[in-house]
Amino acid sequence: MTVCLVVIGRHVPQLKFLDVILGNEPVLTPVETFYQRILANNPEEATEQAEEFAKNSSLTEFFEEIAIPALARAQADSDRGVLPLEDRATFHSAIASMVENLLEDENATAAPEHTEGPIPQGLSGILAVAGRNELDEAAALLLVNVLRLERHIDIGAPLSADALSADAAHLPLFKEASVVCLSLISTSSPARARFLVRRIRRRAPRARILVGFWGSPAREVAAEEMARATSAQAVAVSLRDAVAAIDSMLSRERAPASVT
């Protein structure tokens, strides 16, 4: 009977837990555990997992090593048609709640650096926008909060993919931006990124554009080559790469013009 239940658990996604409980396969990896908690809309347990991880590392590393790979897996499942649209929305809302929980704890132990209330979108000149869906938006939210944690940059919440539609509601934000970060989970093609970069450039003609291909397995691919393929100023495949690229872009923005 046990063998039968294990076999069923391996082949019926809804009964996967039977294989985990009764089988002899290793327990879930940290990424799989996080994926399951977020999919179950359990940001509290996801928060606890992040806090436990950060005791020996940092929240940035948790976002990089656990959350981004989980989002990449979710996008792959969505591409295969096994992650319903409503689950994509759950991923975004649960990760947003987790980040809010984590930042509340961070702020409680640190001296206040900002006035209370929401950060005005575009205050820093940096704008983050999702390329396709809620998963890209969740990844953009992770980048935004890494910038807040590590660079103390006042940056508003990322815009949804709707901001790149024909609707002009967000045009003023783009026009004021000096850096625009386009967030895409790695399964997106350079051709799609190139199309979205063109849209951004029309909305933000003076901005430098960074494309984040989060969770990309091809880290050995030269960033310059990917940037050429997308017509962006920079491409990053990790949050730390993105922060370094934004540092470089901002330093160029602030550099005094040379005197001839």
Question: Where in this protein do the model-derived segments appear?
Answer:
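Short hydrophobic/Thr-rich beta-strand motif most characteristic of the beta2 strand and flanking loop
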Residues: 154-161, 236
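Peripheral docking tails and interdomain loops at the edges
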Residues: 208-260
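Cofactor-cradling patches in redox/metallo enzymes
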Residues: 162-224
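Conserved, well-folded catalytic cores of nucleic-acid-processing
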Residues: 7-11, 15, 98-101, 105, ...
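Short helix-loop-beta junction
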Residues: 141-157, 202
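Non-transmembrane accessory domains of multi-pass membrane transporters/channels
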Residues: 20-86, 99
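Hydrophobic alpha-helical transmembrane segments of membrane transport and translocation systems
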Residues: 1-30
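Long amphipathic N-terminal alpha/beta scaffold segment
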Residues: 67-140
